[in-house]
Design a protein with these regions (language model features):
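Extracellular beta-strand-rich solenoid/capping regions of secreted or surface-exposed proteins
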Residues: 2-19, 25-38
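Glycine-centric low-complexity/flexibility signal
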Residues: 1-7, 30, 39-185
Length: 185
């Protein structure tokens, strides 16, 4: 197992109330657990955006995928021979965007092979679920214009002794990174 599978960043509160003007941007290596001894009410924003893949327009070498963070897996290496994204559902064919929830984007195809997105892997019926973020998208494969895969979205757990309430304006964003765009630049 990786460090992100063994450790969780824990934030513990007596009672948590995030107003509409509050945005919390999480960064770091580990998945995040927000715990409350009473209630959790979120009217603001919780943001855990993963790193995008990169792109290259000249031959030779390659590109690392979007860096793993917040429990999400790294994107695949892009180059002459693209690599799959990391994680349980990592993109298998070159060039994909990373996953978040059940979504991911196919990679760009402009003189290189486009690829599969990573997929999310989770079981909502298990209250003792492992904190596993999204899988990385695969890296692009081509001779000149290639992009690496985006990193998978992070993992977040909200748990309280009382209620967890999401207000009408609440936003929880755990997007996977975009795959590197071979047409940019």
């Amino acid at each position: 197992p990786t460090d992100a599978e063994e450790y969780v960043a824990i934030f513990s509160f007596e009672d948590l109330n995030l107003g509409t003007a509050v945005t919390v941007n999480f960064t770091g290596k580990y998945p995040v657990a927000v715990l409350s001894k009473a209630d959790i009410r979120i009217d603001g924003k919780l943001v855990m955006t993963a790193a995008d893949g990169d792109m290259k327009t000249s031959p030779g070498g390659g590109l690392d995928g979007g860096a793993a963070a917040l429990g999400g897996a790294a994107g695949g290496y892009g180059g002459a021979i693209g690599k799959p994204g990391d994680g349980l559902g990592g993109g298998k064919i070159s060039g994909g965007g990373a996953s978040h929830a059940t979504l991911g984007a196919n990679g760009n195809n402009n003189g290189s092979n486009s690829g599969d997105p990573g997929v999310a892997v989770y079981n909502l019926s298990d209250s003792n679920i492992d904190m596993i973020g999204g899988s990385g998208g695969a890296g692009g494969q081509g001779r000149y214009r290639v992009g690496s895969g985006g990193a998978g979205g992070g993992a977040l757990q909200l748990r309280s002794v009382g209620a967890v309430v999401l207000g009408q304006k609440a936003l929880i964003s755990m997007d996977g990174g975009r795959g590197g765009n071979a047409t940019a630049g």
